[in-house]
Each structure stands twice: as C-alpha cells, then as structure tokens.
Amino acid sequence: MMSRCSFLILLGCLFLTCCTKDGDTIYQPDSDEPKASTAPLVTVIYGKDALGDRSYNDLIYKGIEEAVAKYGLRSMQMSPTSYEEGLAYLQTMFQTVSATKADTIRRLYIVCAAGYDEYIRQNAHLFAENPNADLLYLETPDPLPEGCGSTLYMPYYGVMYEAGAIIPAFLFNECLLLVANPEDETVNLAAKGFTDGFLTDYYQPKYDWGDILEKHLETRYLEDKSGDGYNIADSTAFNLLSELSEVYFFGYIVPLCGGSGNKIRYLCDITMTGNGCMGIDVVVPTEVVSVLKHIDRAVGLCIGQWLSPEGMPKHQVLGLKEGYTEVALNLNEGYTTMYNTYIPENLRQQIHEDAIRKEEAYGK
C-alpha cells in the first residue's frame, strides 16, 4: 500500500513538472527565476548616425543613463543609420503607444531627431489616448497640442551672440560658419546669434602695428535637407578643410554641424593648418573659446519631472538666462591680456545681458 501511494505521488509530480501536450514540455515555474521588470522604461530615438559625435548627442546619452541609474529605470537608446530607419523607429513607437493603452508600465519616449517634425506632430495625438505613455520632443520652439506630449527647447542664439562678440578680442577676424543645413532652426538660429554678436562693434581691437581689425564673416552649408550634414565622411571633412585652408588660412571656423564639426576640429589640430575652431556643446581644451549646451542636465531634469506627481511641463525653454548654455574660455597669458584689455568686466556684463535680452526676443 505504501509503495503504491509513493508511486501515485511520484506520478503526480511528473505530471505537474513535465507533462507534454503535442510534444511540448510544460515546466513548473521556478520561484528563483527573475521576473520581467516593471520599472519605467525610457526609450530614446536619435537622428541619423547621431551617437558617437562626442558632443550634443553623446551628452544626451550620458544624461539619460545617469537618470536611469539615479531613479532605477530601464532605457533603450536607438541611433538609426538612415532617415528611413529612423522613420521605422518612430512608426514602431507610435504603434507601441497604441497597443499598450491597458499596460500599467510607464513609458517615456524621447525624440531628438531633426527631420521628422511633421510626422511626429501628425501622430502625437496617440499619446493623449495612453495614460502611461509620455513624449518628450527635444529642440523645438513650438509646443505640441495639449495632452500630446512635452517639448524642450534650448536656444543657442544668446550664447552664440556672446561668443561672437568675444571672438574679435583674440584677433580672430576671418570667421567661417559651417552650418549643417539651411532648414534646421536650431543651428541656423545659432548661426544668426554668432553673426549678430560678431558684427556688433562693442570695441575696436587692433593689430600690434596699430591697424584696426577688419571683420569678415561667411556662412557655408554642408547639406541641403533637414537632418543632414551632421556626420560627413572623414574623407569629405579632409577635402573640405583642405579647400578652406587655401582661403581661410589662420581663419576661425565655427562648426554648427554636430559630429561633422568634431571631425573638422580634429583635422585642424593634426594638420596644423593654422585655423582655429570653436568648441561646440562641450569644452575643447585646445581651443580658446567653447560654447556649452548642458543638454545632459536638461534631459535629467525632464526625467525627474516626468516621475514627479506634477509631471513634465508642456513646454520648457532652457537657455543662457537659465544657465543651460554658457561660454567657456581657455586663455593663456597672452589671450588673458587681450581679453582684459578689450572686454573689461563692465563690458562683459553688458554683452551677457544683451545676449539674454536678444535671445528672449527671438523666443517670442
């Protein structure tokens, strides 16, 4: 009797742990097996070939991962290799938003990709139908419709105006603006800011022999379409710099073109062309002037707001006045003398205040 009971118990256990139906094995759940995470998920979609630019987009990546570690979140960051691949990512994003209306997992989608504005605005209404999905659309001055997501704009006009006003003090009078394309508002407003600051005569720098510095400024676009021009090939960058060096020897290059600008600046350093090249988004130790955009801090701020009971504001502007952009100087003894001679403290303050005022005027 005892052996029969033991047999029945063993048989029952076998049925519970490894019964088969149509050849498929059904396993008893393992209590030690990790369960799928229900932590909030942050998904980031970049522009074409954006990551690896060692400036703006890499700063976004850094800010996202710091926030993920701080708040115990999950992240998925996607950098497409073509416009079409980026569009496919966005299509998947909107499909997921529609398909997860009953899901309790919170999801934040961050889009920092120029060139998809019309498509994003046409479909953003889907976020209004999903209480647990939110959209943060970066670098647009125009808010989304109510309930369809949040927008963040970090204008570069003010800080570029300030940098443009400072540059002549270091006897950089031949300036070339390299702009990614003529359609993306962010880089073109930055170019406008630099132009306005550079051409404003706050002071009159002179050469050692007494002649007044004459200013010359030219703008050149790398590509024609929105979203393009931010990551040109190495060979293209080399040929471009070779061409520019024949015309702008000892000139100053202001690269408003993402990763393309980093390639140009690196080539300036190793080829000894004599060209200066402004640092953009991050501090470049080899350059006199760098213009910083603290986008890593900004996305961290937005994620913290998203997790808060109040949520993210509908639209935020974080620029020079708010301390999210700034000019960083790296001056040796000679440059320090020039700076103090032409731009004393009271004039520095005036330039800074003018830059803030003009940036705010462009935001209205």
Q: Locations of the language-model features?
A:
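C-terminal motif of bacterial Sec signal peptides marking the signal peptidase cleavage site
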Residues: 15-18
